[in-house]
């Protein structure tokens, strides 16, 4: 919640190319929901005849590929079963549901040594970071935060994320922006992080 007042709604709308949030939801509620609620997205749909010309036939098969972003207290396996149960309750028990990949949700407390070292490293570089409890995206952090390791894990980097996936999405060889490190500065930031961890 403390990061919300520092995030600019107008800049975010411009970057995302949107004029309003889902259901005209207020900005604050949208950000809280982004970090605390699961999502289900349709990645693609295929059905019926898609070749050249036309065919007056009923499709015998349809395919939907979805992704579900999980939050704490959910598991990938349980979520797949809940999707199957929902479809069955709605009369679509004949739909086959397969999980082709995925992982459980992950979370590391903001007061953990790792997150505090990341914040200290950003501040050393002159950046006052926003610390979000979760990302809208997904990454296999549960590999580290879940059993058997149960280690803190997070995403860090002074590289150029370009709003895509991560702060080290790709590196600039040299950067003219003081808030975005070039390749050498990005590499040094990880050294600084290791020293901050002690």
What are these regions (language model features)?
Residues 106-124:
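Short, low-order "capping/linker" segments at domain edges
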Residues 79-88:
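Short amphipathic alpha-helices in soluble, non-transmembrane regions
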